[in-house]
A protein has these predicted regions:
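An acidic, glycine-/histidine-flanked metal-binding catalytic module
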Residues: 7-51, 58-64, 176-192
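A glycine-rich, hydrophobic loop/mini-helix early in the fold
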Residues: 64-110
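Long beta-strand-rich cores associated with HINT superfamily self-processing modules
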Residues: 104, 117-192
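Phosphate-end processing signature that detects enzymes handling 5′-triphosphorylated RNA
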Residues: 11-14, 97-101, 148-150
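Short, Lys/Arg-enriched N-terminal segments with co-localized hydrophobic residues
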Residues: 1-5
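Glycine-rich, low-complexity intrinsically disordered segments
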Residues: 20-24, 42-46, 73-77, 103-104, ...
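Terminal, regulation- and interaction-focused segments at domain boundaries
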Residues: 110-117
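Solvent-exposed alpha-helical segments within well-ordered globular domains of core cellular machineries
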Residues: 52, 56, 85, 89, ...
Length: 192
């Protein structure tokens, strides 16, 4: 029984490797992944820290508006880190080198924060408040509210750089911030 179990485990492992090779990654990508797994995990941890920084900034703004104006402009805050598979697919599509530097420089939406607002005017007010903070750097702005996509998609996208403070250094990390209303978020989920 023990031998059969070991044989089944080995077959399962081989099938998993075959599936990965055939469906997700080439041998070259698999080797790069094995060589870079620790730096990649570290980079993903940095992105998670950057998300926490951005979420905190929006929570503070929401609290401030609650105290000053007796209302909350933010309905919800959602965040995500792009999956490893998503990162590799985007890198391949955009001809970005599969290196830590290539990924960090070439893919700007690895970390994402979506802020759902009650009203359209809240979107611009929150974006302005965020961008006025002296540790936030605007890298790119795409206004799909004023210029909707042909599909009807509407949202304000900001690529920002924000510092994370590590044990011995400060590191600037890119985060994509999407601001939209509840109605725009519903449309985006239907459209996607």
């Amino acid at each position: 029984v023990k031998g059969v179990t070991m044989l089944l485990e080995e077959i399962l492992k081989q099938e998993q490797e075959r599936f990965i090779k055939e469906n997700l990654l080439s041998d070259e990508m698999l080797e790069l992944l094995k060589e870079n797994i620790m730096p990649f995990n570290t980079l993903m941890a940095y992105y998670r820290c950057a998300i926490m920084e951005v979420e905190t900034k929006f929570k503070v703004l929401n609290e401030e508006f609650s105290l000053q104006y007796d209302r909350n402009p933010i309905e919800s805050i959602k965040s995500r880190i792009k999956s490893m598979d998503g990162i590799f697919k985007k890198a391949k599509k955009k001809n970005i080198p599969i290196t830590m530097e290539g990924i960090e420089e070439g893919i700007r939406d690895i970390a994402g924060v979506r802020v759902i607002c009650s009203f359209p005017e809240d979107i611009y007010m929150l974006a302005d408040c965020l961008l006025k903070q002296d540790d936030v750097v605007l890298v790119e702005r795409k206004d799909y509210i004023k210029n909707p996509k042909p599909s009807g998609y509407r949202s304000l996208h900001l690529i920002i750089e924000i510092p994370i403070f590590l044990q011995n250094e400060k590191k600037m990390m890119k985060v994509e911030v999407q601001l939209r209303t509840i109605a725009m978020d519903f449309w985006a989920s239907v459209e996607h």
